[in-house]
Amino acid sequence: MPNVMEYSTMPIFALELDRDGHLSKKTMKLAREEQLTNTLLQGFYPGIRVATVDVPTEPLDACEQAIVEQALTRVEFDGIRYSLVGASGSAKKGKFYAVETKYEKRLAERFRFSPQAAMTYFGILVSSCKVMIEVPDCRLLVVEDRQLGTNDCRGWISHSLFKRLQAKHREDLVAQEMQKLLANRKHCPGEHEDCQLNREEQATLEERAGSKIDHKVLRGHRFYQFRLAFDKAQAKGSFKIMADELAEKLEADVILPKSSVKPRYQGGVLRTIRSILGDRQAHAFRGSVLVGIRDVSRDLEFQSSYTLVEHAPDDSIELEIKPNALRQIERLRKAWEENNFTELFELLGTQEAQSVLDVGEDTDPEYTSSEYTVADGALVADGTGYMLKHPFVNHHLQRVLARWAYRLCTSGGFRLPGFALADDGYLVLDRGQVFCSSDWIPNDRGIASVPSRQGLIVRYPIRMKEDLLPFENLSVDEVLSLLSADLEKHGCHMSDQQAAAVVDQQLRLKGTLTLHSEAAARNGGDFDFDQVCVVEGDKFPRFVRDRIMYQEQHSAQKNKAPKPPSPWWNLPQVAMQARGNQIGSITDLKTSCLANGRDDLARQLVDQLQNALDQLKHGTQPDQDVIRNVRNEVSKAPWLKLKQKQRIADMDEHLPVTERDKIGKLYNFLRKELGRYFSDAAVAPLSDFRGLIGGGGFTPEIFAECSTINKYYANVVTQILSRRRELWNELENANAAVEAKKDDAEARKELLFRRNQASAAYSAFEQRSKEELRALIDQVRVWAQGKNGTRLAYLSALHAIVCRDRGPDPEHEFVPGTGSIVFYAFPQEVVDQIAARTGGRPVSVEIPSLRDGEVEIDREGRIFLVSHFVNGDGQVHERLIFLAQVTRKGEVFCERDAQGSPIIAERVRPFPIEAGRSEVQGGMVTFPGTQRRPEVPKGRVALPGSPN
């Protein structure tokens, strides 16, 4: 049986310092990132003790700043001395990493004893990967960017090394699944905990585990984000796969551009001289290498944003964006009135129809769909519609709809296809010669799997209109023609068939948008797995045309000036300077400038936004005087204040906006169309759901244990909500004090500082409370995971406790709430019980080519249109006309080829098929006698908004 890496889970101690320098322990999360699962740091030093240290993010006076900096030099917990060693992207939120002091020097050496480099790049070592392996004898080659078909942060990995990663990934997944299956088996009736499997049982269990995880294994024909370490260096970026023949020719299993190595690769004087003299192997390394795959390209979907729509022309808003939004509102209204969840589930990230699968993708056969959260799963499984009234589900739904309504009213609510940004580099071997090239497609062209010929490439955050990059989408034939011409230029005369294979394997990878590096850099992109989306010219022709005709007025490039050197002992001071994330506030201030018709002020903020983006990497700082002066010139766009509303009913139906405020006018137009979707009577008491969970007998001991865990959960949530309310009141009082002294300049200065402290403290607590709630949910889930074999009993007891009438009870203290703990502790069991107790919802499959009408479905999944005709005897008869078939493997087809083989149109999640009569409406066919069984993946939760 395959084994998981021994050091696959390393817990991190979560600590925090207050402004007085007092150190305390935070609740520990169980996420992969918080356990260093599959990280480089774990690979270097198995068993190393690591702690995160959170510092205050609010403004500190000189004394408080010095106290916190001193405290960072002497972190001690449970008798272990820790030393600060760096940060990840979370430095902006005041979160830093510390390790046992004995490891400090070794880690500092990896960053050349530079505090700035450690603050910027330590995150490479603690980034959790999907899979990681150590290659004892790896051949690694470092080259200049764009040599051997590389580009900015984009390298090559050999096919055989990728297959090893793929095999290790599968091995890890199978081992984890086997552990689950064995745990379930031990708690089955009649089984003993020490039972041993015979060879046949072991093989059967391994086969079952393999079938359940096949769809999760790394797939080929993708773009891969990596983390890598060799010698005393670390690297990050993206890989394409090169053929093994090329790897042997170049004597390299991995090829890295220098830009991937962080801090930037130097290589020594002798290697540099050899490189200048043309020695391709000058920067070759052979030895132990740790390499991991962090992410894989796939088809993505981005939501529109007001930072995008504010650059749309008026005619696009009127004729393209508004009509799309109105159609969404009408579909939602109709679905709501008819109790049809199709559109509603789409808003929640689920689908009424069976989800379409990727080619070659496998799924867990026990479930008909995979939902985003347990609340979504409850709605999908419910056959009555009454679960909408459940306090927890209703609260979740209200929040989701409020977020959707805000997006709709401020950005039109449309969706954009998303991609990983990839380069055009290729590397081929033809007739024993190596041919390669980079940046050979024209600057204004791109390769993307969208039907539109023209489009705009969007990379968030959007600094200015110039960031919306117009591009022309190359067809397959055009890419092939350009590639053939470039190969010819380099003396390569491969066949069209071979060139087509290069296009397929290196240039049109799934889930990627391929660009020239100069084009990517125009809006701040590189090839370190940046993600972009596309405004399609076919759907938004006026928007795209307006940007193409626009005369650019400003250019903002990344500031890559080297950081000033600083000694290692200044690491705490550098850490405190890295705090603070102004990206969001500057972006919203820029938006307010545009809403007030002050385009000139918005342009002043473009460079400040870039400085904020470069703050951690390049040590730049936004000019606070510029920001302050702009803030004094413009008022905040009123619709920005509605961003955090939890219910549609709390969003103003009309706002006072300026004539130049495109988003404000769009909001006022769409908000009045939304109306209200929930009344005060929309929520039923928890006691209405007492009979929902049944069939699990429990003992008084189980009931008492569940009562204890419920009290603990409710107390923690209550404390968090109470503290949030206290901080909010402090902020309100600080605002009132500033307003009361608005004419006293001297007093106002101190009061403004305290107000800013209160505001930052409230914002920091909002983020921290989310982390603590997730940690609490993790604790509840760990408790529940130990109940294998008695899960239904514990679920029944816990459900009875939270749904009990709130009358006095001398033995048990019950806390009112939404019943959220039940959904978090036993998510899959709750959803399964809802499906069983309500009768569930039938499975539907969308086949757009089907015409509406009555259909008959047989046991093989064949769908026949029922046609009625009158025979010569005057009697009405039926004729069955074949329309389509959904096989038991989930294959959907409507016709066969000349050899009689089905032409597969798409694949859906397989489900048990029953024969019977049904109806087709709008291309949707419902299968009679079926029941949806949603799967709720672990870790997907909606945070509670109230105790219990």
Q: Where are each of the predicted segments found?
A:
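Beta-strand-enriched accessory nucleic-acid recognition/scaffold domains that flank the catalytic cores
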Residues: 1-524, 530-531, 536-948
